[in-house]
């Protein structure tokens, strides 16, 4: 039975409607999938950028923290150096004051004579040479001569050795030093410095740990004394 034109048109419309509906559904499916993929990619990009930003600021924060530590360490070192310099300056001032007071000892002739007696005899014992030369300030010559005369017999008794001790009258010690003597062996290759300044420096060096402790307290980090 042949279809009429109306039936043909109806079937064609039905087929076109079906095709159109299927096309729309396919388009919607494609759009939905594209939107889903877009959202996934967008989320991935956002997360990647967020991680990069977090990593950047974490790195910056660590750098700033490290810079703070370095600056703090530098400030602490500078402060420590200032304290050490201040301590050294104070100790130097104390030593300079002590050196200035040596002149008072020299002005007391009786006290100075006793001191010279000890310095000369000590120098002889340190050298233990058969011939020794004593140098002193020109103004101290009489006192040093008396000290040498006292020291020779004491030296001979103690060492059971003879000794020749001369006072150098050609090259005196500088007048600006506080006093004391220098003692040489016969060829002047060995010297014992027993000037008042050298003795004070030696005593100061030996007592430096005690001086620091008295002035600034004990150092908890110091295992050995100077």
Curated annotation (Swiss-Prot):
Subcellular location: Apical cell membrane; Cytoplasmic vesicle, Secretory vesicle, Synaptic vesicle membrane; Cytoplasmic vesicle, Clathrin-coated vesicle membrane
Keyword Cell membrane part of the UniProt annotation: yes
Membrane-spanning residues: none
Entry comment describing in which tissues the protein is expressed: Expressed within the midpiece of sperm tail (at protein level). Kidney; localizes to early distal nephron, encompassing thick ascending limbs and distal convoluted tubules (at protein level).
GO molecular function, one term: proton-transporting ATPase activity, rotational mechanism
Keyword set includes Glycoprotein: no
Phosphotyrosine PTM sites in chain numbering: 56
GO cellular component term of the entry, any: cytoplasm
Alphabetized UniProt keyword annotations: Acetylation, Cell membrane, Cytoplasmic vesicle, Hydrogen ion transport, Ion transport, Membrane, Phosphoprotein, Synapse, Transport
PANTHER family on file: ATPASE H+-TRANSPORTING V1 SUBUNIT E1A-RELATED (PTHR45715)
Function noted in UniProt: Subunit of the V1 complex of vacuolar(H+)-ATPase (V-ATPase), a multisubunit enzyme composed of a peripheral complex (V1) that hydrolyzes ATP and a membrane integral complex (V0) that translocates protons. V-ATPase is responsible for acidifying and maintaining the pH of intracellular compartments and in some cell types, is targeted to the plasma membrane, where it is responsible for acidifying the extracellular environment.
UniProt-listed HAMAP family: ATP_synth_E_arch
Subunit structure: V-ATPase is a heteromultimeric enzyme made up of two complexes: the ATP-hydrolytic V1 complex and the proton translocation V0 complex. The V1 complex consists of three catalytic AB heterodimers that form a heterohexamer, three peripheral stalks each consisting of EG heterodimers, one central rotor including subunits D and F, and the regulatory subunits C and H. The proton translocation complex V0 consists of the proton transport subunit a, a ring of proteolipid subunits c9c'', rotary subunit d, subunits e and f, and the accessory subunits ATP6AP1/Ac45 and ATP6AP2/PRR.
Protein name: V-type proton ATPase subunit E 1
Gene (UniProt): Atp6v1e1
């Amino acid at each position: 039975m042949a279809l009429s034109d109306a039936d043909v048109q109806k079937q064609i419309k039905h087929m076109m409607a079906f095709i159109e509906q299927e096309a729309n559904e396919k388009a919607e499916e494609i759009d939905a999938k594209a939107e889903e993929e877009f959202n996934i990619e967008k989320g991935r990009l956002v997360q990647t950028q967020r991680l990069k930003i977090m990593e950047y600021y974490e790195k910056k924060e660590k750098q700033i923290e490290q810079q703070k530590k370095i600056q703090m360490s530098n400030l602490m070192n500078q402060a420590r150096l200032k304290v050490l310099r201040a301590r050294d300056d104070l100790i130097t001032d104390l030593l300079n004051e002590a050196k200035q007071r040596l002149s008072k000892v020299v002005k007391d002739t009786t006290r100075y004579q006793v001191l010279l007696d000890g310095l000369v005899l000590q120098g002889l014992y340190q050298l233990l040479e058969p011939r020794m030369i004593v140098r002193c300030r020109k103004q101290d010559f009489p006192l040093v001569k008396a000290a040498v005369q006292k020291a020779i017999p004491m030296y001979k008794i103690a060492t059971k050795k003879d000794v020749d001790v001369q006072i150098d009258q050609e090259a005196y010690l500088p007048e600006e030093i506080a006093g004391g003597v220098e003692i040489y062996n016969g060829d002047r290759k060995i010297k014992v410095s027993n000037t008042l300044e050298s003795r004070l420096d030696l005593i100061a060096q030996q007592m430096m740990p005690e001086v620091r402790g008295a002035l600034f307290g004990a150092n908890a980090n110091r295992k050995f004394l100077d």
